[in-house]
């Protein structure tokens, strides 16, 4: 079993990386999330999380980011290959409880895994 940490090497941190994903990445969508994906030059899969102010106040935005990070941390082994992924929360995701957010992420990650190959 691998480490459950989420180190900086597995995070998208630079604005240029986010812009590259938004311009030329492929997208997968659910009702409450969008995933922008692109092959990575690094040797790991990196995750970025975007939750805009339209989603809610800081407490709600941080809750959504925390759940997304935790879900990725526990399920990153299901994603094969080296890619950059940006998970973008849609406006009404804050109306969901934690279980419903995880279920939506499960649907999104299934779409991401199906796009492997």
Swiss-Prot record:
Enzyme class: hydrolase
Listed name of the protein: Ribonuclease P protein component
Entry GO terms, CC: ribonuclease P complex
Entry EC number(s): 3.1.26.5
Gene: rnpA
GO molecular function, one term: ribonuclease P activity
Catalytic activity: Endonucleolytic cleavage of RNA, removing 5'-extranucleotides from tRNA precursor
Role this protein plays: RNaseP catalyzes the removal of the 5'-leader sequence from pre-tRNA to produce the mature 5'-terminus. It can also cleave other RNA substrates such as 4.5S RNA. The protein component plays an auxiliary but essential role in vivo by binding to the 5'-leader sequence and broadening the substrate specificity of the ribozyme.
InterPro entries to which the protein is assigned, alphabetical: Ribosomal_Su5_D2-typ_SF, Ribsml_uS5_D2-typ_fold_subgr, RNase_P, RNase_P_CS
PROSITE patterns given in the database record: RIBONUCLEASE_P (PS00648)
